[in-house]
Curated annotation (Swiss-Prot):
Assigned keywords, A-Z: Endoplasmic reticulum, Isoprene biosynthesis, Magnesium, Membrane, Multifunctional enzyme, NADP, Transferase, Transmembrane, Transmembrane helix
Single annotated GO MF: squalene synthase [NAD(P)H] activity
Pathway where it operates: Terpene metabolism; lanosterol biosynthesis; lanosterol from farnesyl diphosphate: step 1/3
Catalytic activity: 2 (2E,6E)-farnesyl diphosphate + NADH + H(+) = squalene + 2 diphosphate + NAD(+); 2 (2E,6E)-farnesyl diphosphate + NADPH + H(+) = squalene + 2 diphosphate + NADP(+)
Gene: SS13
TM stretches of this protein: 281-301, 391-411
Protein name: Squalene synthase 13
Location within or outside the cell: Endoplasmic reticulum membrane
Alphabetized NCBIfam families for the sequence: squal_synth
Length: 415
């Protein structure tokens, strides 16, 4: 759960945080008994706790397919990311990865921590993959093949231009969007979305992660590959690592704002994609990460902290997004609120201010035209109730009641 200080400052976070904690515990207890499926779901919770929780929104068959799709691509990504593997070894592996998923004897030791376990025990993922229906397997194989080919191309190529950046993000994330759309369609729950909209869903998330993770990636040892395009950063500094130095703060923020503005171009497509979804479970599965993405961009924009430390939404706000995202009106409301926050941070002297404002106004126009903004729950316009001692007292009363309830249940279970 969030820290006590954060809860006291934002007491309305408490209930969503509590619900999130209970849901996470429940999700971890839903691990199947069959060995290969037990491995896959327990590994899913280890490599992505948030995804492991969001995936529980889906029905059983689709949930299994998405779980395996995620783990297969996570394994492929582990090979791509391992800088200790030579290009001569790495390229053939990623190119043939779509074949390896059919071979339950195949494994390749690489990565660290839980990712090494995933790779060493990959036969569990292969066995689970082989259990899936043929339409699910075909979709996963196709996307894995295309992603592997794209990764192989960029193992030997730097991201120089914005077109390169879009192409790389297509291979590693846009294809995930295409694959998920295929899985949703295969389940019979959704019409097949267009490739361009599916691609934008992936690019919006991937570009947000690339922006947010600048400092972690630039400081990684051994040195990680970087994906900020030279066409953008070279306008501001001579070397990409120069952005992290305090004397370059003004230029660094301008570069950051340029990157955020580039990411915002995908937001309208994302809204269109989500508005076309019919099933509430699939809708929540798709919508929650997209709201988190625009919220993260709003925090990163014009913020030197991106080059100094970690910038992310507080856990309580994340819990609120997960708890409150139920309908498209919630999505329009969140995108509108976060675009308002972004707009308030635009410096008119920024070289990209006009372009940034234009993109934000386009997002706001789409949200307004939905006609649902009056129903929205605000994520970012908060009252000063965080300092209200009565509310703080209520929190501790609730905690005491909860503790007593859980303790009594524990005693009853022991009898």
């Amino acid at each position: 759960m969030g820290s006590l200080g954060a809860i006291l400052k934002h007491p309305d976070d408490f209930y969503p945080l509590l619900k999130l904690k209970i849901a996470a515990r429940h999700a971890e207890k839903q691990i199947p008994s069959e060995p290969h499926w037990a491995f896959c779901y327990s590994m899913l919770h280890k490599v992505s706790r948030s995804f492991g929780l969001v995936i529980q929104q889906l029905g059983p068959q689709l949930r299994d397919a998405v779980c395996i799709f995620y783990l297969v691509l996570r394994a492929l990504d582990t090979v791509e990311d391992d800088t200790s593997i030579s290009t001569e070894v790495k390229v053939p592996i990623v190119m043939a990865f779509h074949c390896h998923i059919y071979d339950n004897d195949w494994h390749f030791s690489c990565g660290t921590k839980e990712y090494k376990v995933l790779m060493d025990e990959f036969h569990h993922v292969s066995n689970a993959f082989l259990d899936l229906g043929s339409s699910y397997k075909e979709a996963i194989e196709d996307i894995t093949m295309r992603m592997g080919a794209g990764m192989a191309k960029f193992i030997c190529k730097e991201v120089e231009t914005i077109d390169d950046y879009d192409e790389y993000c297509h291979y590693v994330a846009g294809l995930v969007g295409l694959g998920l759309s295929k899985l949703f369609h295969a389940s019979g729950a959704e019409d097949l979305a267009t490739d361009s909209l599916s691609n934008s869903m992936g690019l919006f998330l991937q570009k947000t992660n690339i922006i947010r993770d600048y400092l972690e990636d630039i400081n990684e040892i051994p040195k990680s590959r970087m994906f900020w395009p030279r066409q953008i950063w070279s306008k501001y500094v001579d070397k990409l690592e120069d952005l992290k130095y305090e004397e370059n703060s003004a230029k660094a923020v301008q570069c950051l704002n340029d990157m955020v503005t580039d990411a915002l171009v995908h937001a309208e497509d994302c809204l269109k994609y989500m508005s076309d979804l019919r099933g509430p479970a699939i809708f929540r599965f798709c919508a929650i990460p997209q709201i988190m993405a625009i919220g993260t961009l709003a925090l990163c924009f014009n913020n030197t902290q991106v080059f100094r430390g970690v910038v992310k939404m507080r856990r309580g706000l994340t819990a609120k997004v997960i708890d409150q995202t139920k309908t498209m009106s919630d999505v329009y409301g969140a995108f509108f609120d976060f675009s308002c926050l972004l707009k308030s941070k635009v410096d008119n002297n920024d070289p990209n201010a006009t372009k940034t404002l234009s993109r934000l106004e386009a997002i706001q126009k789409t949200c307004k035209e939905s006609g649902t903004l009056s129903k929205r729950k605000s994520y970012i316009i908060e009252s000063e109730s965080g300092h209200n001692s009565a509310l703080i007292a209520i929190i501790f009363i609730i905690l005491a009641i909860l503790y007593a309830y859980l303790s009594s249940n524990l005693l009853l279970n022991k009898q």
